[in-house]
Amino acid sequence: MERIIMHYDMDAFYASIEINRNPKLKNKPLVVGENIVTTASYEARKYGIHSAMKVSDAKLLCPKLIAIPVDKKEYIRISNEIHNLILKITNKVEFIATDEGYIDLTGIVKPENKKQFALKFKERIKELTNLTCSVGIGFNKLSAKIASDINKPFGIYIFENEKDFIEYISDKKIKIIPGVGRKFSEILKHDKIFLVKDVFKYSLDYLVKKYGKSRGENLYCSVRGINHDEVEYEREIHSIGNEETYSIPLQTTSELEREFNSLFEYTYQRLIKNNVFSQSITVKIRYTSFKTYTKSKKLKFATKDKDFLYNEMLELLNSFELEDEIRLLGIYFGDIKRSRLVQLTLNKDL
């Protein structure tokens, strides 16, 4: 059966939420973030402003730029509304961030109805949130991801097959390939790889030897539309977790605590959404040196008590002896149970 994979991506998610809350901000250059830009409105992007840029640098490009503090709690609330809507359609969905995800439509939508479904999906999100999203549909996750970025904002693009995909991307800059960031792109330029089609002259063996197994295989396969990754939806749930990688590493304890609170809230809402209980917790950190550490704790009972889980997980986080800037933070609820009988309420004597 032909695979039908859809990728949705909310348009300038944080900035669009702030414009919704204050319509006077519409059509004005706006960024969300006090020190670092997390999201730039489309008006701000016209000045060359982008995420991960220092707000002070952004204001040099646009002196009239408006900077608004991050309100992760509100963004997560709206993200959960979107997730709940999608889960009413199918559980074959992989939420990869608050503002994007993959949906496996194979067997749900007929091939001839792909565009009609995408249009209805976008409109339903707009009705629910007054926000727009862009949708890409392809024959695998790679093609769907690239497709969703083509007609932003509020756009749709569909790749019917590998031939269609290769014809489109061949003349595009190599950075269109997921995993080819700014630094890797510069390395490729030194080797005279500027466009996607420049990769075709090299063998898989050469690319792996030159750039390493992971990067080499990704280049070779991606330019050919080859990607067999499954949409990793939750079947039988054993753990619920999330990780966040920071393009600007966390440097202070206050930054770490802020991001921990946000990540905990998002992950806890997934626990509640699935109506399950956790009896173990894990915290993971990765430094800029790429040293990675995890700490776990087995709880005496399975619970979904928010305050209890938060305090236990915060205690785990505080037990790390921080030795460097942090580029990744992850938290996980494990040993998942569905029965309420194993939970002891904290309002009773234990």
Region spans (language model):
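Gly/Gly-Pro- and Ser/Thr-rich, intrinsically disordered tail segments characteristic of DNA damage-repair
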Residues: 1-216, 339-343, 347-350
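DNA-contacting surface of Y-family translesion DNA polymerases
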Residues: 7, 189-328, 335-343, 347-349
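Hydrophobic/anchoring residues in structured secondary elements
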Residues: 137, 331-333
